[in-house]
Amino acid sequence: MKKLALLFSFFTLALVYQAQAQTSGAVISFKENSIDFGDITQGQQVAHTFVLTNTGKQPLIISNVAATCGCTVPSWPKEPVAPGKSAEIKVSFNSAGKVGKQNSVVRIYSNASEPIEKVSLISNVLNPTN
């Protein structure tokens, strides 16, 4: 019985330590993680700036930001984002050659507790009227 209690205590402490380790690093919080442009005309370019805040206790380092296709181009801060500070990820979408519902996903790779975050640009691309 004592061994069981000791084992239980060990696992409880391990879980608490793991939870503490995960929350003591950088944490990304987005003001919004998607934007819907509604109907746009084929060939139109749209852009949005996603604002993020590092709500963690360590500097946030964004190592890469990647889009699902070449029609979506992100730009992001290359310098660390201090705890409590905000930064911007700017994303543009070129609808040339696209028709119908579009959902361009952008992945943000960082040292945050959740190392991959996603934001998306949603639109419905209409054929141009001649």
Regions found by a protein language model. Give the residues of each.
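Extracytoplasmic/periplasmic beta-strand context in beta-sandwich domains
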Residues: 63, 104, 117-119
